[in-house]
Amino acid sequence: MAPVGVPGLVLGGGISFFSNKLGWACDNVASYEVVTASGLVVTASPTQFADLYWALRGGGNNFGIVTNFKLNAFPLGKMWGGQRIFTENNFPAVLDAIYKFATVGSSKDTDAAEIVSFGNYPGMGKIAIVQTHYAQPIANASVFDDINALTPVMDDTGIGYLSDLTIKMNGGSPNDTLGSLQTQWDATFKVDRELFSFLVNTFYSLIPDVQDLQGAFPTISIQAITEGQLKGMQKNGGNALGLTPAKGPIFIMNMSASFTNAADEATILKFLSTIIKKVKAEAKAKGVDNDYIYMNYASQFMDPIASYGAANVERLVSVSKKYDPAQVFQNLHPGHFKLSKGAPNPNMP
């Protein structure tokens, strides 16, 4: 989306319209210019300070102040994309479509990206927002045939430049969410069609707990981490996230909620934590749970770096101690997710 800052996106991983073809944003960094704790400025790349380069690919702001990114660019003219809104009677077909995309379509056509979100929209009730993007100026490519066959109540898809399409994506939330309070949460699972239905049904079963709160607009999204994305993560020695093609395809369940009254925060947080707990329990029972937590969607009650796996955490800590022996960025730099301190707030509602 247009308001997202590039540095944080890249340091936390970075999912884009092009991830199915090229990997995440962190996998397409040629080099980082970093001011280390000692004041030494280094350029980390696959051939220089390679250990620091690896750590910065998903390790967040734990290793220094990144002052410059050099990214591997590629030519892009116009592309196609946008979003379509579907009513509740289409939910089974929408879930079938994202399942087929995650397991089959995304491997056959790496130019494609697809995210499905669910919410209660004022005046419309239960809706599914399907965001589809294609890295060519081709409308309704065959990889999206299952979605193309459905009849939306709103369709703003079209051909345009990347900047136009990212601005258009902001239309996925009510206009009055600007200035609201906001919280995001996520969890990851093996792609499973039954779990898709379970998480959507769980979300709507709990909506009454928050639907009457002032300005409340919660959503839940299914974002596939495709075979192409997982393969792209292995470039240049791999990243720090601990994900491999053997673990896929997987998907991120991303939940967000905007609201306007600070007094409602506890209710909103309890609503989201309850969904997480219920879906995690169901996924574990089905054998499709995955520990990974995407840093850029994580709440303050989560520890994304721990989800990278014990070996990667140990390696990240080693890199941190090498370039920051006094642990300035672990102990004096406030905020965000540290390497081995757990969730910023360990008291999940």
Language model regions located:
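Soluble FAD-dependent oxygen oxidases
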Residues: 1-349
